[in-house]
Amino acid sequence: MSMIAAFYGGKSILITGATGFMGKVLMEKLFRTSPDLKVVYILVRPKQGQTLQQRVFQILDSKLFEKVKEVCPNVHEKIRAISADLNQNDFAISKEDMKELLSHTNIIFHCAATVRFDDHLRHAVQLNVTATQQLLLMASQMPKLEAFIHISTAFSNCNLKHIDEVVYPCPVEPKKIIDSMEWLDDAIIDEITPKLIGDWPNTYTYTKALGEVVVQQEGGNLNIAIIRPSIMGATWQEPFPGWVDNLNGPSGLIIAAGKGFLRSIRATPMAVADLIPADTVVNLTLAVGWYTAVHRPKSTLVYHCTSGNLNPCNWGKMGLQVLATFEKIPFERAFRRPNADFTTNNITTHYWNAVSHRAPAIIYDFYLRLTGRKPRMTKLMNRLLRTLSMLEYFVNRSWEWSTYNTEMLMSELSPEDQRVFNFDVRQLNWLEYIENYVLGVKKYLLKEDMAGIPEAKQHLKRLRNIHYLFNTALFLIAWRLLIARSQVARNVWFFIVSFCYKFLSYFRASSTLNV
């Protein structure tokens, strides 16, 4: 019997960010392994035209929860959706709901965050720092609370090369940042943002670092742990390989490359692609929740959930495997044939952006205008290039994350728990995982039927032929213009033609003599 699964039986659990990618995988694992848990509270932002119960059914109406419905048929009755807005004071939770949360909650998994790299600092501080502070205040009023698990990111201290499992201080105290966001206007915040974030590449990583400091400073006597996952990708094993439902992380790049939009990216092929499957993160999270509640560590422990130190895979190897998978399971209606390359400097990056990204988009939009349709490709391509520029920092560097606490926790688990809640990334086969990832993107994100693969392959063959014809025509036109304008080019052309004619004449004469 799994000790971790038994621990969550009968518990009342609060999950923030339950409608997000990790939140859904976390709920699925909880209900599948501990169907006898009491209730899962989820904070849900109200949507016009949808009741809270409809939001619950919308979450459960996914292939992800198929196994859960078999082991826990009344799962919809065990999910208690509470209307909340993390942008508001006290999350705009009603008095009745707040009373219920404070009275019954045993475990908190704080997964909610804004993950937009280009988010305005005010909004990023509100969701990643202030909301964490308010949730800690709520937690301090929960008499039955056993553990508070805060999900951060392995890149919260990406301004360092080597990162230990500790909370690092920030140059400016979080309280000062929170206070300043309340009275500064947007124009001033925009002006001071670069100075505030300093060596951090964006507001996301900076505010996640601030959030960790808040957890450490204001946790009081709570049993708290911090988990730092790296780049979260599709599921590895549970509940099945390849499940993904958002465009964050590599998923958006896989679609852009598979559809032929992404042709070049500035990245270091030998840099470590620190990708971590979502189910690995969830297994570690549940194990940490159990350990924190049962063993009650004296200080806040930080757990790194990364792959680079234990089972590294670089961007070059990953890119080749993704392209190889496209040959077997191509995406439908591709814009161009998948063929993405790495560049390593600004000059080649700008060149390929102009030639392989912007130029085809402009040509296609011109064609759309001629046929009376609305142009859209240039706008889409500009959005892709903005995304690539925000990712450059992360795909051109490698980090070293210590994993002492994570390995310690693994050694504390029984063989049964190590099997049921497996977070040992050393067992991960990258080639198999990436193939399942691409397949998952096709099935669960793009909603493409596997029966359409033969037609998708035929479409790629047509695109290949068009590519060859276009390049040949372009070469002939360029050469013709060059011959018309340059005596040197004409001389070279006549020399080549003369040489070929003489060679063919010699070959014909030799063949006649042999006969």
Swiss-Prot record:
One Pfam family in the UniProt entry: Sterile
Disulfide cysteine pairs (residue numbers): none
UniProt source species: Bos taurus (Bovine)
Alphabetized GO MF terms: alcohol-forming long-chain fatty acyl-CoA reductase activity; alcohol-forming very long-chain fatty acyl-CoA reductase activity
Enzyme class per UniProt: oxidoreductase
Catalytic activity: a long-chain fatty acyl-CoA + 2 NADPH + 2 H(+) = a long-chain primary fatty alcohol + 2 NADP(+) + CoA; hexadecanoyl-CoA + 2 NADPH + 2 H(+) = hexadecan-1-ol + 2 NADP(+) + CoA; octadecanoyl-CoA + 2 NADPH + 2 H(+) = octadecan-1-ol + 2 NADP(+) + CoA; a very long-chain fatty acyl-CoA + 2 NADPH + 2 H(+) = a very long-chain primary fatty alcohol + 2 NADP(+) + CoA
GO terms under cellular component: peroxisomal membrane; peroxisome
Name this polypeptide is given: Fatty acyl-CoA reductase 2
Cytoplasmic topological segments: 1-465
